Swiss-Prot record:
Protein family: Belongs to the PurH family.
Organism of provenance: Lysinibacillus sphaericus (strain C3-41)
GN (gene name): purH
Keyword flag Cell wall biogenesis/degradation: no
Name of the protein described by the UniProt record: Bifunctional purine biosynthesis protein PurH
EC numbers for this chain: 2.1.2.3, 3.5.4.10
SMART domains named in the record: AICARFT_IMPCHas, MGS
MF-aspect GO terms: IMP cyclohydrolase activity; phosphoribosylaminoimidazolecarboxamide formyltransferase activity
This protein's pathway: Purine metabolism; IMP biosynthesis via de novo pathway; 5-formamido-1-(5-phospho-D-ribosyl)imidazole-4-carboxamide from 5-amino-1-(5-phospho-D-ribosyl)imidazole-4-carboxamide (10-formyl THF route): step 1/1; Purine metabolism; IMP biosynthesis via de novo pathway; IMP from 5-formamido-1-(5-phospho-D-ribosyl)imidazole-4-carboxamide: step 1/1
Annotated domain remarks: The IMP cyclohydrolase activity resides in the N-terminal region.
């Protein structure tokens, strides 16, 4: 009996050569629609599916292969006498190979002006059904959903007349991953609930990593197919070694901070916390400020810049050991300077597409925590000056800078700033005064006349007391403590201006 292969693909890459090889190996090709026409136009003998089903395509092609003559051939066990008897009774012949890929639903909904009707018409029904039938029966049927697998299948067919059970099992598993992902894109597109009763997310493997956070941990990097282009997952690497797990974590943290600024800005990150943030009239000035903020911790750090890197900035960057530099672009002169450093990684990301994902997702043992990103910045805050003294223009600028940075620092967080740069960062402390002391120690004499930003309210007035001792003259914090008045009174006592925002910025 002639072996049969059913081919129906929307992605025609490599399919003509694959079909010709199957014919040469003695397979009869079954096909439908555009695939059938393409094969026939290229002199490949094809049997139309409706010749097998004895039923025409109907409903504008919505029903083609949904027929027992097809699915019986896919699901029947080749070595089961009962199955074979039933197939013979109904004139059903087995199908040994299925090669199907699906309507381009994701590509369709990615178009800027896609209509609802276009999206719905690109939901494939017959394709996933055939794939699942063939994958279920992989003991006997070879199912292919990825053109990268054509060569492996042909190699095994030529060598032994059939594919191995190991290959068929791997291909079947790939099919079920593929159809599950396909369905998740559809369900997410159709879902209107913010937090539905079940949550299905699809990520595709971008790369295997050398190791995870530590050398004994295995790791890989997955990306969203419909994710934001403003992401390391879609960055273009111009130079350097492949990214590590920690590089990706730190790079992502740097990106989230630098996109807070419209003026030229530079952000240095170590262990997912900023060690230096600087702004300026030029990018070179912004980097100078970020470096000045903490010239020790920046060593081995990640730098994110929000403007094209020019030669002057690149020259200064080249004198420091840095893991990664991320920017919208690099001038040719800057590339010539920086690529002399063998190991530094240079990445570009389209800043004009800077946006956040719909949700932040955190894995916990046995589940996921899902929340909206913290999108509230200075412009969203309900600013209230709660002290007798109003901030000066320079203090307002320093407070705004501090508030833009502190939301990205691990809680409890205190950030000390002037109008252009961070002066001290107290991160991840179990009490607020402890975080403040770290920030003051780092700022040193520069804390005098500077501003302080706190990610959460002061439970008592001791942080204001410590700020006054360090020389701080302006404070920004959410407010909301039952002892707010104590902090206000203490600020007034020392002539400190203080504003409440009404917004907390915990970060764990």
């Amino acid at each position: 009996m002639t072996k049969r292969a059913l081919i129906s693909v929307s992605n025609k890459d490599g399919i003509l050569e694959f079909a010709k090889e199957l014919v040469a190996l003695g397979y009869e090709i079954l096909s439908t629609g555009g695939t059938k026409k393409m094969l026939q136009d290229n002199a490949v003998a094809v049997t139309a599916v409706d010749e097998v089903t004895k039923f025409p395509e109907i409903l504008d092609g919505r029903v083609k292969t949904l027929n027992p003559m097809i699915h019986g051939g896919l699901l029947g066990k080749f070595d089961d006498d009962s199955h074979q008897a039933q197939m013979n009774e109904h004139g059903i012949e087995p199908i040994e190979i299925v090669c199907v890929n699906l309507y381009p639903f994701v590509e369709t909904i990615s178009k800027p002006n896609v209509t609802w009707d276009d999206a719905i018409e690109n939901i494939d029904i017959g394709g996933p059904t055939m794939l699942r039938s063939a994958a279920k029966n992989h003991q006997y049927v070879t199912v292919i959903v990825d053109s990268n697998d054509y060569a492996t299948v042909l190699e095994e067919l030529k060598a032994g007349g059939a594919t191995t059970i190991e290959t068929r099992r791997k291909l079947a598993a790939k099919v079920f991953r593929h159809t599950a992902a396909y369905d998740s894109y559809i369900s997410n597109y159709l879902t209107e609930e913010e937090f539905p009763e079940s949550l299905t997310m699809t990520y595709e493997l971008k790369q295997n990593l050398r190791y995870g956070e530590n050398p004994h941990q295995k790791a890989a990097f997955y990306q969203k197919r419909l994710g934001s282009d403003f992401s390391l997952a879609y960055a273009t690497q111009l130079h350097g070694k492949e990214l590590s797990y920690n590089n990706i974590q730190d790079g992502n943290a740097a990106l989230q901070i630098v996109k807070e600024f419209e003026m030229p800005a530079a952000v240095a990150v170590k262990h997912m916390n900023p060690c230096g943030v600087g702004t300026g009239v030029t990018l070179e000035e912004a980097f100078d400020k970020a470096y000045e903020a903490d010239p020790t911790s920046i060593f081995g750090g990640i730098i994110a810049l929000n403007m094209e890197v020019d030669a002057a900035t690149a020259e200064k960057l080249s004198h420091i050991f840095l893991e990664i530099i991320i920017a919208p672009a690099f001038s040719q002169e800057a590339l010539d300077i920086l690529t002399k450093k063998k190991n530094i990684r240079l990445l570009t990301i389209p800043f004009e597409q800077a946006k956040q994902d719909q949700f932040n997702v955190v894995s916990v043992e046995g589940g996921l925590l899902v929340q909206e990103p913290d999108r509230y910045g200075f412009a969203n805050a309900d600013i209230k000056v709660v002290t007798d003294r109003e901030p000066t223009k320079q203090e307002w600028e320093a407070l705004q800078l501090g508030w833009s940075v502190v939301k990205h620092v691990k809680s409890n967080a205190i950030v000390v700033t002037d109008s252009q740069m961070t002066l001290g960062v107290g991160a991840g402390q179990m009490n607020r005064v402890g975080a403040a002391k770290i920030a003051f120690e780092q700022a040193g004499e520069k804390a005098k006349g500077a501003a302080l930003a706190s990610d959460a309210f002061f439970p008592m007035s001791d942080t204001v007391e410590a700020a006054a001792a360090a020389g701080i003259t302006a404070i920004i914090q959410p407010g909301g403590s039952i002892k707010d008045q104590d902090s206000i009174d203490k600020a007034n006592e020392y002539g400190i201006t203080m504003i409440f925002t009404g917004v907390r910025h915990f970060k764990h």
